[in-house]
């Protein structure tokens, strides 16, 4: 598989647990996501170790700070050699533009988080964001595109609308992916792999259904098979 579409979320508290799981996966069949918990515990050394095993890494630290600080953080992350990194679109235009300037196009894929998949309408109302979740996501995605970033992280429930509004040359990364027979956990705006791809997602972030499976490699193969079954009838291969 030349361009694995599944990104396995390594939501572990330490490097030992993460590496135990990674040893059971094939780098040709998935990429790996390292988030705040694992990166805080294990640092860049773990990222380098996993890249040494052939895995491409999505560094999911959601940088959100003043423009100079975010630019410096992005530059440092890019120097690690990661495949993808993200910032938070709510940081605004100047922050997004500074991140793009620090990480030139064609080097690391630079994307932005729109809304966390744990947020629903009541959360938006409480923090004062106007509009329904899909409206807020579309505004933030348009801002991200205008600043020259490569794509956004968004709920699979927003992918179809974003794909139609923004077009094919914009990467949509979707967390909140669960097989039809699994628990939704704390995420509220979720979807199955098939639904997400049919709606226009490019990459699927999947954590517990794989990492907590009795046979993670078997579950990964099953999910990849689900994806392959619909690729020929989807715009999926055109990205």
Swiss-Prot record:
Catalyzes the decarboxylation of orotidine 5'-monophosphate (OMP) to uridine 5'-monophosphate (UMP). One of its GO terms (molecular function) is orotidine-5'-phosphate decarboxylase activity. SUPFAM superfamilies: Ribulose-phoshate binding barrel. The active site is at residue 62. This is Orotidine 5'-phosphate decarboxylase. Keywords: Decarboxylase, Lyase, Pyrimidine biosynthesis. InterPro entries: Aldolase_TIM, OMPdecase, OMPdecase_AS, OMPdecase_bac, OMPdeCOase_dom, RibuloseP-bd_barrel. It comes from the Bacteria. It catalyses: orotidine 5'-phosphate + H(+) = UMP + CO2. Homodimer. Pathway: Pyrimidine metabolism; UMP biosynthesis via de novo pathway; UMP from orotate: step 2/2. It comes from Nitrosospira multiformis (strain ATCC 25196 / NCIMB 11849 / C 71). The keyword Lyase applies. Coiled coil: none annotated. The keyword Lyase applies.
